[in-house]
């Protein structure tokens, strides 16, 4: 069996994401962890496939993402890359693997050798030096600000960020800092819609929202969440796209359409 797909669809590259932002075309991003789903997501025209440390939650059954290792991410990145998706392959740097710029570079090299085309790191102003270090060494970077799940204990739980005037100002400083350091993409998680809209206007790079309203340049969800495969209470920002659909492929197509036409997320999925 082979997972290689014949496709005339042009590959999504880092410059292509920037061009999409400038053209006003929304970016559809989903997490991806194996070759089978990578091939399916690619057929559904998902623009970016993220090998997220969320695999700790949805694959390993962990309560947080903290136990996920670099080897875990590298293994799943290689699985996704073997499907040769046309969408951009982005891999998370797990907790504890980018404490210094040198550590971050060593971790990024391992993931890029496994097939990643960009790495994602959680953090704002304090991370700018590391972002710059990576970009100067030809590592494309996606930053992640707002609710950063690796900081769950520091936050005292999974809480919306940027709700106060001071919090919103800090979030904007964080976003500007990583952009100025060279990040080419930024995820805004669990951020009030108005704050995320302001950040999106202020930056020149694409913003990807998850619980950050419809004004971002694109959206991301955890694959298992949007397919209705989640234990316990569904997060506010998640929509179950499997409802009313005959197949997983149809559900993913519905997600991509909803992101592209701006119907997802709605106010009920935002803060």
Swiss-Prot record:
Top-level taxon in the UniProt lineage: Bacteria
Keywords: Cytoplasm, Magnesium, Metal-binding, Pantothenate biosynthesis, Transferase
Record carries keyword Methyltransferase: no
Residues the entry annotates as binding Mg(2+): 53, 92, 122
One Pfam family recorded for the sequence: Pantoate_transf
Enzyme Commission number: 2.1.2.11
Main location: cytoplasm
Catalytic activity: 3-methyl-2-oxobutanoate + (6R)-5,10-methylene-5,6,7,8-tetrahydrofolate + H2O = 2-dehydropantoate + (6S)-5,6,7,8-tetrahydrofolate
Molecular function (Gene Ontology), one example: 3-methyl-2-oxobutanoate hydroxymethyltransferase activity
Active-site residues per Swiss-Prot or TrEMBL entry: 189
InterPro entries the record matches: Pantoate_hydroxy_MeTrfase (IPR003700), Pyrv/PenolPyrv_kinase-like_dom (IPR015813), Pyrv_kinase-like_dom_sf (IPR040442)
Cofactor(s) this protein cannot do without: Mg(2+)
Cofactor binding, per record: Binds 1 Mg(2+) ion per subunit.
Protein name: 3-methyl-2-oxobutanoate hydroxymethyltransferase
Organism lineage string: Bacteria, Pseudomonadati, Pseudomonadota, Betaproteobacteria, Burkholderiales
Gene it is expressed from: panB
